[in-house]
């Protein structure tokens, strides 16, 4: 049988595969697909699929999903869905109630939690079923409807009936992809009440959030809206943007609580951690009333949704329409199923390549730098390796990192490399406050105008230092993980990573800091410092594989 010219390609594995896993994955793919050497991808072979029963095909798909993720169910839904059977379902608050056998959907509604066993020095997995058996069927989070519909047809009343309005902003130039993202989101909201927009740093998340708020207000004049994120810096930034469009958001956080000062509004810019801390002390009655009655809840940095502090807020707002915003809505720990359950599917993805092509972002020069190990440090590392306790990997890992971080010679090499690149303003990201202070001191001794900042720095002082970097009164600002989210410095030219590790979410957030466009800025530079030890180099290899794929076409990597 001749293949369709328009090949339907399947996603590549979403994780590193051992030799055994790779062989199993390849054998499974051969059951339903052909390999295209020109693209190095598998594409569907309808003849192979036609020879399988639905149960056989579903069994193969369940196994392949372990390697490439649940998107395969959506791609092959037409082959496995039972078109003759209509399942009754309804939405109530946070949940969707299904009158069908849970067993049929278990694979779709199960995720695996990865936890690191420090005693064994390796990851272990635990299966979590995100559904609850009932006498009439089962219940799951309403956003997971998008998973369920891949294998069944449902009789489901729409969540709402929003009309899309062609809104014009007064003070911001809207981009086509921002408008299209809201159109797609409104479409998904009408079905299930929520949706996520995958929006890289620099794509204008604040504008998208404002557009969503204005769409809701067009549909309901007296709508109540909550914009929630964990960073006071981001809250303040959003509040300032929103005021330009006559949306008077009141800021509520541990540092600034404008409600306590007597401010009143139907629009709240809320710190998620502040809400959670108030709730734990049972002091959140007024805030809970605002959250519970919200017509729209916007969750920025939505990849944090599985955290208890975010889940708690969303569960307290059961009937709200929701918008999730994140550059990284897919997590490494398997918990993206919780994100989907509470915020829905990805309604729209804003593409890096398009942003760079249209000069909304700049391309990246990624420099992988491994400082030489001085003799004294080499002896110290050897001693740590020889005497490490196999049952206490965490202590060994921490000691190893600290040895490199506190090495004067290593830090001098790093500073020399920064001076050689000569790309200012520069942001250096470190793990600990003590290192930030020390590096700032060494840099000043070496003629660099440098300062440091952390989450413990008072908001006013923090904003002053960020403004100093933005205005180029500072050459270098050294920061802890405070810089991972919400730092808006368009003219930033260099980000230096001194954190090690392989977290994809943090990496994307940090790379995003340097991709914003400004005058005379043609590229953004990343200096990724890899400490010279097998442990960190192995982490770096996995990180490089991810970066090459994520930023394909807009990144140049220097090894």
From Swiss-Prot:
A motif (DEAH box) lies at residues 300-303. It is an enzyme of class 3 (hydrolase). Its EC number is 3.6.4.-. GO terms for molecular function: ATP binding; DNA binding; helicase activity; hydrolase activity. Keywords: ATP-binding, Helicase, Hydrolase, Nucleotide-binding. It comes from the Viruses. Signal peptide: none annotated. The keyword ATP-binding applies. The keyword Hydrolase applies. InterPro entries: ATP-dep_DNA_Helicase, Helicase/UvrB_N, Helicase_ATP-bd, Helicase_C-like, P-loop_NTPase. Residues 186-347 form the Helicase ATP-binding domain. ATP binds at residues 199-206. Residues 410-552 form the Helicase C-terminal domain. It holds the Pfam family ResIII. PANTHER family: GENERAL TRANSCRIPTION AND DNA REPAIR FACTOR IIH HELICASE SUBUNIT XPB (PTHR11274:SF0), RAD25/XP-B DNA REPAIR HELICASE (PTHR11274). This is Putative helicase 22. It comes from Sulfolobus islandicus filamentous virus (isolate Iceland/Hveragerdi) (SIFV). The lineage of its organism: Viruses, Adnaviria, Zilligvirae, Taleaviricota, Tokiviricetes.
